[in-house]
C-alpha cells in the first residue's frame, strides 16, 4: 500500500496559498531555526506519513505516481538535512531504483495536479505509524507493489489475480485439490462458494429469480445465462461459420464440428462424441435408462432437457418467440428451425440428389425415398411407412372400425 510523506520544508510553498507567505520575510531565519530545532527532536519518517488506500492509489495516473515518488524521496532528503536520523524503509530504496528507469514518466508538478494536491491537503497533519499498510478487504490481504502492479501471479500459467485468496483458489485447477466436501453426497469442490451453491441442490433453495418469467435459480450465473433467452443475447461467435451462442461452453462444443474432434467414445458401439454430456445421453440408448420422469403423466426421458421441453406440453409455456412474426415455441431448437423459414436458410443437403432442407429430420425423412427404408410399422396390419406422421395418418383407418 502506498504512502505519501509531505516534505517539511516544501509544504508551505507547494500546498498552501501564496498569500499566506507574503509579509513573512522578517524574522524568517529565526523561524527556520526554531522549526529545525523542533523537527530535529520530534519528527520522524513515520510520524508525518500520509497513506493512500488501495482505491485511492488505483485512481492515480502514472504522472501522479511519479509525483508521489519525487515527494517521497525529497522528504527523505529533507529530514536528513535537518539532522534527523532516517532509517531508509525498503520502499525508499525501491523508489530510488525506479527513478532511474522511469524518468520518461515525469512532467507533472503539484501546481498542475489539483486532484492529487487536494487529496494531500486533506490528509496533511494526519500522523501514521505504519508507512506500509496492508489494507484488508473482507479479511483477505491484498498485495500490491508501490506502483499498483498486481503481485498475485500463478507460477504455472502466469495468470494474475487481485487477491491472494483468488490465486489460491485458482491454483487448485492445476493441483486438482478439492478441500470442500458436501456432507450429504460427498461431492468435493475447490472453493467454499461452489460448495454453498451445490448445497442448494439438496435443500432446494433458489434465491435468484428471473424478473421476466419468475423462474428461480440456485446461483447468479445460471440466472445470467437464462436472461439471455429473454434478451436474445448470444455473445459467443464462431470465427469459422459465424454462428452465435449464448454460452462459451456451447461455442466450444460447436467448434468441434469444424475440427472433427471427438474425444468421448462409446465403449459399446464405438461412436464418438465431442462432449461428455452427449456421450452420457447416448449411453442411455444402450442401457435403456430414462431417469427423468414427468410428475404430471409419468412419462420418462433420457435427458433432463427432454423432460423440460415435455413439461411445457402440460403448462403450455412457449418462452421462445420469433422476433419477425411473433410465433412462440416451447424450445429454442424449434425457434431456430422456424427462423429458417424467414431467412430461407437450408443447411442440410441430400448427398444423393442435392436437394436442401432447413432441418435435419426433414433430410433424414427424404433420404428414405432413396434407400426405401420404412422404419415405422403399423401394429394392426403390418404396413410400413417412411415417417411417423404417415403412420399416424394411416392408423386413423383402423380407429374408425374400433
UniProtKB/Swiss-Prot annotation:
Pfam families found in the cross-reference section: KRAB (PF01352), zf-C2H2 (PF00096), zf-C2H2_6 (PF13912), zf-H2C2_2 (PF13465)
Name of protein: Zinc finger protein 558
Lineage, opening ranks: Eukaryota, Metazoa, Chordata, Craniata, Vertebrata
Function: May be involved in transcriptional regulation.
Keywords, in A-Z order: DNA-binding, Metal-binding, Nucleus, Repeat, Transcription, Transcription regulation, Zinc, Zinc-finger
GO aspect biological process, one term: regulation of transcription by RNA polymerase II
Family the UniProt entry places it in: Belongs to the krueppel C2H2-type zinc-finger protein family.
SUPFAM superfamilies for the chain: beta-beta-alpha zinc fingers, KRAB domain (Kruppel-associated box)
Keyword Hydrolase (UniProt): no
Disulfide bonds: none
TM annotation in the entry: none
Span of domain KRAB: 43-114
Organism: Homo sapiens
Protein localization: Nucleus
Main location: nucleus
GO CC entries: nucleus
Domain of life: Eukaryota
Amino acid at each position: 500500500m502506498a504512502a505519501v510523506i509531505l516534505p517539511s520544508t516544501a509544504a508551505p510553498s507547494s500546498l498552501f496559498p501564496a498569500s499566506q507567505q507574503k509579509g513573512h520575510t522578517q524574522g524568517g531565519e529565526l523561524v527556520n531555526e526554531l522549526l529545525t530545532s523542533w523537527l530535529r527532536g520530534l519528527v520522524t519518517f513515520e510520524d508525518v506519513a500520509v497513506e493512500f488506500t488501495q482505491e485511492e492509489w488505483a485512481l492515480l495516473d502514472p504522472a501522479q505516481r511519479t509525483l508521489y515518488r519525487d515527494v517521497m524521496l525529497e522528504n527523505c532528503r529533507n529530514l536528513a538535512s535537518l539532522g534527523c536520523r532516517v532509517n531508509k524503509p525498503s520502499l525508499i530504496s525501491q523508489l530510488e531504483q525506479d527513478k532511474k528507469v522511469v524518468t520518461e514518466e515525469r512532467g507533472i508538478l503539484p501546481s498542475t495536479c489539483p486532484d492529487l494536491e487536494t487529496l494531500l491537503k486533506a490528509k496533511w497533519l494526519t500522523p501514521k505509524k505504519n508507512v506500509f499498510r496492508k489494507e484488508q478487504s473482507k479479511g483477505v490481504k491484498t498485495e500490491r507493489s508501490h506502483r499498483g502492479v498486481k503481485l498475485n501471479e500463478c507460477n504455472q500459467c502466469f495468470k494474475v489475480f487481485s487477491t491472494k485468496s483468488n490465486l489460491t483458489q485458482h491454483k487448485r485447477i492445476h493441483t486438482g485439490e478439492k478441500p470442500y466436501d458436501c456432507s450429504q453426497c460427498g461431492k468435493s469442490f475447490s472453493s467454499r462458494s461452489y460448495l454453498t451453491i451445490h448445497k442448494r441442490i439438496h435443500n432446494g433453495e433458489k434465491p435468484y429469480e428471473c424478473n421476466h418469467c419468475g423462474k428461480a435459480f440456485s446461483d447468479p450465473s445460471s440466472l445470467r445465462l437464462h436472461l439471455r433467452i429473454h434478451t436474445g443475447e448470444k455473445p459467443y461467435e464462431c470465427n469459422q461459420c459465424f454462428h452465435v451462442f449464448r454460452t462459451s461452453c456451447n461455442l466450444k462444443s460447436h467448434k468441434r464440428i469444424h475440427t472433427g474432434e471427438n474425444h468421448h467414445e462409446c465403449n459399446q458401439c464405438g461412436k464418438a462424441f465431442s462432449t461428455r454430456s452427449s456421450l452420457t445421453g447416448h449411453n442411455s440408448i444402450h442401457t435403456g435408462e430414462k431417469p427423468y420422469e414427468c410428475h404430471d403423466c409419468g412419462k420418462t426421458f433420457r435427458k433432463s432437457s427432454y423432460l423440460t421441453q415435455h413439461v411445457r406440453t402440460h403448462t403450455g409455456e412457449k418462452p421462445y418467440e420469433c422476433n419477425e412474426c411473433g410465433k412462440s415455441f416451447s424450445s429454442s431448437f424449434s425457434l431456430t428451425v422456424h427462423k429458417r423459414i424467414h431467412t430461407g436458410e437450408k443447411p442440410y443437403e441430400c448427398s444423393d440428389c442435392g436437394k436442401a432442407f432447413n432441418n435435419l429430420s426433414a433430410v433424414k425423412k427424404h433420404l428414405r425415398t432413396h434407400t426405401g427404408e420404412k422404419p415405422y410399422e403399423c401394429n394392426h396390419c403390418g404396413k410400413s411407412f417412411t415417417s411417423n406422421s404417415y403412420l399416424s395418418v394411416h392408423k386413423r383407418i383402423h380407429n374408425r372400425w374400433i
